[in-house]
Amino acid sequence: MGSNDYYDLLGVSRGASEEEIKKSYRKKVFEYHPDRNPGNKEAEEKFKKISEAYDVLTDSDKRAAYDRYGHSAFANGMGGNQGFTGGFDGGFSTDFSDIFNDFFGGGFGKTSRQSSRENMRGSDLRYDIEVTLEDAFKGVKVPISYVTHVQCSHCSGSGGEGTAKSVKCGTCNGAGRIRTRKGFLTIEELCHTCSGEGEVVKNKCKRCAGSGRVRNEVGILVTVPRGIENGNKVRVNGKGEAGYRGARSGDLYVYVVVKDHKFFTRRGMDLYCNVPIKMTLAALGGEIEMPSIDGTWTKLKIPEGTQSNDKLRMRGKGMPDIQGGERRGDMYVQVTVETPVKLTKKQEELLKQFEDESNANSSPKFSGFFQKIKGIWKDISS
C-alpha cells in the first residue's frame, strides 16, 4: 500500500497549508472513494487512510502532535496529557460535508439514504460535434450515438431478479453508514455493501449483477439552437450515465465546434468578409449584390470615392441572438479596390487622359503625401 505517512498519503509537503491539504484531499478522495471503486478492497483501504490523514492534518493540535510524535501520538488512545496539550476528547469523527459537497452537489446534513442516492447518481458525459456556420445560423438537429450505462431492462433498474425484495443490510444493520475506529480516531463513511441505502437486494439481477444498469449504445437527436457559438455546450438532461439501482441519471453535455467558413468570419453576432471591387466602381460609386448567411442576396451601396480597406456595414445581416427573438448582428464588408491589368491600347489612352486631367483634389492622399515628403527633405537640407 506504500507509505503510511500522512503527508505522503495526501501528496503534500510537511509545510503545506491547510488549503493545499484540502485541495489535494479532494482529488485523492474522489479517486479512491468506494462508490467509484466497487469491490476494490485496496481502494477502500486507501480511502480510509487518506481520510484519516486529512482529519489529522487539518486539525492544528493533532497535526502538531503528529509532527512531533508521528503515528505513536494516536496509538492506544493516547490523549492530550501525553507529551502535548490540545484538549482531545478521546473520540472524534471526520466531517466530510465540505469535501463531498464539491463532488456530489448535496449536503451531508441530509439523511444517509438521501445523500447515498445522490452519490449513486450516474456520471455526466461529454460529446463533441461539428456544425457549419449556416447550421449555427438557422439551428439544426444533429443525430449522435454513444455507448454508456443505461437502465437494465431486465430488472427495470431495481437490481433485483424478478420480484426479489430488498432486505436490511447486514453490514451496517440498516443504518447506511459504518464507523471505523483507529486509536481515538473514528471515521464515519457510507456502507460499501449497500452504498448507503441500508438495504440490499436479496436476489441480484443476473443481467446487471445487481447494479440496475448495463452498457449499451444510445442514439438521440441533439437540438443545436440558432446563434450557437464555437465552444458553446448544449445540456441534454438525463442522457448521461444511468445511476445505480434506479438512482438519477447524469446529464449529457454536447460541446459544439462551429467550422470555419470560406467567406465569412464571425465575431460574436457580427459577420465579416472581404470583397474586391473595380476601380471605376470605387471612384464613381454604385451597387453590388452581396450573399448573406441566410442564403439570400442583398444590394450593397458603394459610395463614391471608396478606398481599399474601407468597411461598409450591412445592418441586421449577421448572426441571430442565441437568447431568441428576431435581433441579428451586422455584416461588415471590407473592400479591396482592384487595379486594372492587361489593358487594351484604348484603355491605356483613356487612363493617360484621365491622369492628364487629374489634379490634387482627385487624389488628395497621394498629393498630400508627396507634399509632406518634400517638406521633410526641405527642412533637413536647410
Swiss-Prot record:
InterPro entries: DnaJ, DnaJ_C, DnaJ_domain, DnaJ_domain_CS, HSP40/DnaJ_pept-bd, HSP_DnaJ_Cys-rich_dom, HSP_DnaJ_Cys-rich_dom_sf, J_dom_sf
UniProt-listed Pfam families: DnaJ, DnaJ_C, DnaJ_CXXCXGXG
Ranges where the J domain occurs: 5-70
GO biological process, one term: response to heat
Residues that, per the record, bind Zn(2+) 2: C169, C172, C191, C194
GO MF annotation list: ATP binding; heat shock protein binding; unfolded protein binding; zinc ion binding
Superkingdom, taxonomy of origin: Bacteria
Entry cofactors: Zn(2+)
Residues given in the record as Zn(2+) 1 binding sites: C152, C155, C205, C208
Cofactor note: Binds 2 Zn(2+) ions per monomer.
Keyword Kinase in annotation: no
Keywords: Chaperone, Cytoplasm, DNA replication, Metal-binding, Repeat, Stress response, Zinc, Zinc-finger
CXXCXGXG motif repeats: 152-159, 169-176, 191-198, 205-212
Cell compartments where the protein resides: Cytoplasm
ZnF (CR-type) intervals: 139-217
Any single Gene Ontology cellular-component annotation: cytoplasm
Cell inner membrane among keywords: no
Any coiled-coil regions, as ranges: none
Protein family membership: Belongs to the DnaJ family.
Function text: Participates actively in the response to hyperosmotic and heat shock by preventing the aggregation of stress-denatured proteins and by disaggregating proteins, also in an autonomous, DnaK-independent fashion. Unfolded proteins bind initially to DnaJ; upon interaction with the DnaJ-bound protein, DnaK hydrolyzes its bound ATP, resulting in the formation of a stable complex. GrpE releases ADP from DnaK; ATP binding to DnaK triggers the release of the substrate protein, thus completing the reaction cycle.
Domains as described in the record: The J domain is necessary and sufficient to stimulate DnaK ATPase activity. Zinc center 1 plays an important role in the autonomous, DnaK-independent chaperone activity of DnaJ. Zinc center 2 is essential for interaction with DnaK and for DnaJ activity.
Subunit record text: Homodimer.
Listed name of the protein: Chaperone protein DnaJ
